[in-house]
């Protein structure tokens, strides 16, 4: 982890930076602190308070925006939670001919508009997707051990199986 600001680079510890410094997080940083149970519980809390008591939820979390070019596209998802704190945006860039997708997450302080963090969103996206599936399985499946059906065999499939195993006893997995 490192912070940047005013041309200086400093090491950040325990996710803290000096005032005015932006925290830069790469995939390795995310992986080094990630925990399935923490992620799933954070999502559980977020989904329980998702409406923030706001009548126009779309004002806080507008529909995604997509810009398309000849060889790629850029999608933006943004949100401003009602509790204050941070607001953010996730950018997804895709170049289908190159078979490449990249993600960037930017977090800002709602009170000051200060850029707090920039994170490579590749690992975060995989973890969040799998943690959401695990939360759904935990809430919707009958109590007790599970046999999990998995589509595919890549990064997402492996992450989904690990996430479900963090909240339930998995007695088997079947490729579908």
Task: Identify the role of each PLM range.
Residues 2-6, 10-126, 134, 141-144:
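N-terminal ligand-binding/catalytic initiation module
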Residues 29-30, 120-124, 150, 170-176:
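Flexible, glycine/proline-enriched loop segments at strand-loop-helix junctions
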Residues 22-25, 165-169:
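Acidic/polar active-site rim loop that often engages polyanionic ligands
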Residues 133, 141-167, 173-176:
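Glycine-rich adenosine-cofactor-binding loop
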């Amino acid at each position: 982890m490192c912070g940047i600001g005013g041309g200086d680079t400093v090491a950040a510890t325990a996710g803290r930076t000096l005032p005015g410094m932006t925290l830069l997080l790469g995939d390795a940083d995310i992986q080094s602190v990630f925990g399935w149970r923490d992620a799933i519980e954070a999502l559980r809390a977020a989904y329980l308070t998702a409406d923030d008591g706001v009548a126009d939820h779309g004002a806080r979390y507008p529909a995604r925006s997509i810009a398309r070019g000849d060889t790629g596209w850029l999608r933006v998802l943004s949100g401003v939670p009602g509790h204050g704190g941070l607001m953010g945006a996730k950018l997804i860039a895709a170049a289908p001919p190159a078979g490449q997708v990249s993600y960037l997450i930017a977090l800002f302080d709602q009170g000051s508009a200060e850029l707090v963090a920039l994170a490579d969103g590749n690992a975060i996206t995989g973890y969040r997707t799998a943690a959401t599936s695990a939360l759904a399985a935990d809430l919707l499946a009958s109590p007790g051990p599970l046999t999990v059906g998995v589509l595919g065999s890549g990064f997402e499939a492996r992450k989904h199986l690990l996430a479900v195993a963090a909240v339930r006893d998995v007695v088997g997995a079947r490729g579908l």
